[in-house]
Amino acid sequence: MYAVIKTGGKQYRVAAGEKIKVEQIPADVGSEITIDQVLMVGEGESVKIGTPVVSGAAVKATVVSHGRHDKVKIFKMRRRKHYQKHQGHRQNYTELRIEAISA
C-alpha cells in the first residue's frame, strides 16, 4: 500500500517502512505524528484519489531526526561591472519513518 501526502508545501509518495526527509516539523525526536493531508491512496489496482484529500485517510509517522541539508551556493555576477555576490543557504529538514497508512 502506498499514499501521496502533502506536507511543507510539497508532495511525497510514501509506503510503510520508508524513511523520508520533509521540511522541518516542530516535533520532538521519537514522537509520533499523524499526517491527514493524504491526496491519494493506492493498493495494487485499486486507487483512491481525493478531491483534494481522501476523507478518513491518515499516515502515521515517527520522527527519526532533525538536520540540515547540504549547502546550496548562490553566486550572482554582472559581467563587465566588477559586481560579484556570494551567498549560501542550508535548509532544515525532519526525517520521518512511515509506520502505517490507513484509508
From Swiss-Prot:
Keyword terms: Ribonucleoprotein, Ribosomal protein, RNA-binding, rRNA-binding
GO cellular component terms?
cytoplasm; ribonucleoprotein complex; ribosome
Q: How does it assemble?
A: Part of the 50S ribosomal subunit. Contacts protein L20.
- Give the function comment from the record: This protein binds to 23S rRNA in the presence of protein L20.
* GO BP, one annotated term: translation
What family name appears in the similarity comment? Belongs to the bacterial ribosomal protein bL21 family.
Q: Which Pfam families match?
A: Ribosomal_L21p
Against SUPFAM superfamilies, the record matches this protein to: L21p-like (SSF141091)
Q: Which GO terms describe its molecular function?
A: rRNA binding; structural constituent of ribosome
Name of protein: Large ribosomal subunit protein bL21
Q: Which domain of life is it from?
A: Bacteria
